[in-house]
């Protein structure tokens, strides 16, 4: 990004995986009057005036659609479970706005669907996603369904894979969601 800025472009397109890592570069763009367009990665702490516009998916809706489709595939397993079941979610991070919204959209819709079928739900794992979850109604030990959310220490397929394997190794795990390409490749 710094090389691109040094060439004094007429504009810059940016899809940052680690949004906090580009803040200094965005300040430099402001000082050089270089407009920045972000793609599908809202930068929550972007310096004022540094983002000309954002082109993005409705990530909360995308997560919600993923939950609806997954639930259609697993609802009979959930309904007939003799004990607690786990639905996993792997997010590459808890800092990029698009990942936060997509992961949160999945969790919130899954909670809604499970509760509509009479199940109690807990969200466990990564603190950001646990705190952001809406309407979870049970403690982990007491829930019919636990949505287990994992975020690796760094954004790599290998570390997402490690997180996915930790969830998948639980005998009562019935499904897992990878919220973007990196996380999905790790799940696979």
Label the predicted regions.
Residues 1-188:
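A residue-level marker of the well-folded mature domains of exported/periplasmic proteins
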């Amino acid at each position: 990004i710094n090389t691109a800025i040094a060439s004094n472009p007429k504009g810059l397109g940016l899809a940052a995986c680690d949004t906090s890592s580009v803040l200094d570069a965005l300040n430099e763009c402001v000082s050089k009057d270089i407009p920045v367009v972000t793609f599908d990665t809202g930068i929550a702490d972007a310096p004022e005036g540094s983002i000309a516009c954002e082109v993005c998916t409705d990530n909360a809706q995308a997560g919600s659609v993923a939950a609806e489709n997954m639930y259609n595939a697993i609802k009979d397993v959930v309904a007939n479970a003799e004990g607690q079941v786990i639905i996993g979610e792997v997010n590459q991070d808890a800092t990029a706005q698009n990942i936060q919204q997509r992961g949160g959209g999945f969790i919130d819709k899954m909670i809604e669907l499970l509760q509509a079928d009479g199940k109690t739900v807990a969200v466990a794992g990564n603190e950001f996603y646990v705190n952001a979850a809406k309407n979870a109604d049970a403690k982990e030990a007491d829930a019919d369904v636990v949505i287990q959310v994992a975020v690796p220490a760094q954004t790599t397929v290998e570390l997402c894979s490690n997180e996915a394997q930790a969830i998948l190794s639980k005998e009562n795990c019935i499904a897992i969601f990878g919220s973007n390409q990196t996380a999905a490749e790790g799940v696979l």
